[in-house]
């Protein structure tokens, strides 16, 4: 447990950590095929819950020790190579480029990140070049996935028999042959309506035999059928197993193949180190209309410019394409994709007509033909991302010996992400999942971009006195900036369907819609941390951070967030030295206060939207369309920090030469 772990603005021996921390190593990431960094944490970090919707390229929701906020965001902070990044940036990182991940869980560990760390912190360290010969590595994998339904679905015959029996049990069955199947009654009453939807008639009739005059072939009912089941003496010949069952889920699924390839280079000397990689991911979904592709380029370099100055820079470039086909977030109770649509369709609803063509009726059980809608719906999102992390570190002890143990470090990081979301729904799209519009040939083209940068200046002081006192001091100042802007266009009755969302101008412009958005926010912070160790047994960590956020009200922008933690290395005490099988035993307790400012940047001042002022002051309609404005968000001059105070008590242990380790 003496391995070094990242703790936020520095590193520590794992045995000296006073807060709640879980580490996920490179070895753990390689143990199973993962497409993003968050999947590597799943099931490997206690107290971390990851909920995914299984769409390729989706990150899912991460919760560290549950939710902390009622209305604001509960997402953790992601820090990549010391630079805070947005949650979406995790999709742009190739998991094979990750050296380690540390999850900070309690307030005493996360308080060093102030308001940004209120929901926990995920620290990611990417690979760096290593001293030695140039090494070139290739990693490639291919995996398969399918959807294995745990539900034993009824076939068509079982469903109609069940419907009929439920009516018999309710004394509501009205067949001419007692309780026996009746082709003149059942087709309309229990089979979706063969009179109203003629395409169902051949499917339903397959369970019966008919004479040349169209009447059903009859047979003698058995004594059991007459006395127990309530059949008439003569009943139609009937076999429900002959009713075809449409394999809707088979139509929309497949055995998905995922390819993952990476080529990396590592090189280094005592003065410089270099790591670079090229990676390609091609992930199919078991649903035929979904897939994901990602291309990444990663470059990390460090140079020991002089004995006292080290500089480094990392650049990550990414491009990804997500195709989602039929997808909806309309409500929490409806189907969300083509597979959900398929499970909602009746098993007796045919996908093809008698000529083998796709059915596209205007109503009835086959109206939302899954095969037809897959062909009519396209949803594609393209991302272009760039992340920069850089640092310069000055060791004053190498300049003047009395200053040994004092270092200055400046970090600068930036992130740019551009997204284009294109959606197109053709003329035969049947709106199966509750979309807002049922207009024909609808196209959406949404563009958004995000820019963020972070600047941090830090001073580190590490001193040891009389061999038993170890003192560490960290002082930091940081500034952060975030900017987002977007534009969206909606077009109806597009003239060129093959142009998808690239020709929205050729549409019914009287129905077109356009919107745009912009927001920016700033944060500033000052932080101090003290680490003290007595005889390498008794540990104290004190942290204080002064945070300011532009999103909050004028008088509430700044606040102070403290934390404290104590730890006792019981295994270092003399009374345990004779017990050889106990290698690590540490008891820790921590308390901290964190803040959350994840609110709309303009909520304190309110927001205005334009609106036709046709009915001002309840005076009735005005003949001219006069443009007015109304408040969409009421101003809140008292909006301040949402604070969470928490206490954590834990124990870390390692037994039998640390073959058995754990935390509680």
Residue map of PLM features:
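Short, small/polar-rich motifs associated with maturation and membrane association
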Residues: 1-284, 288-298, 310-312, 359, ...
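Generic structural signal for well-ordered, non-transmembrane alpha-helical segments
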Residues: 164, 346-349
